[in-house]
């Protein structure tokens, strides 16, 4: 279990370095932003599934079998006996103690598999040529502090997120970029899935030892 997180950190760092080279330094394009690129909005590249979220109280979860992860704003909160989502999604923190990091970048979870989510995170999938991998990299490198509202309870509401401006490259560039970063994310997500399996097995073995 302890060996996998450093590997995943390196995989993500590599993907972030590729993003920086392409979309910050524009190295494949002679150091200049191509004129064919444009500024669009998040709702042009992300599909929202917030209407499918369903919060469960701790009392509701107490009697459930611990099978599927139950996600909150920034992490797994619990495990439950059913799931709402099945596939690859991004969860972007909607409200909580923190919704952006020190650089103003949104807090994201990149998930694959069956899971439940409460209403403290926006549920997204890529569209218009954006995969969940490229959507993750574009959003995680975007300063969204201007749309964070609320002093006591910071929040990024859906309307502000959908309309937030973001750079959209042409489809050929995006396809090439996707082909480079996908193997990195694929390995990272598979590693995380293996971690969850091992953690579940460990919990099962421990419960049998004390019963």
Language-model segment annotations:
Residues 33-34, 38-169:
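DNA target-recognition domains and sequence-specific DNA-contacting regions of bacterial/archaeal
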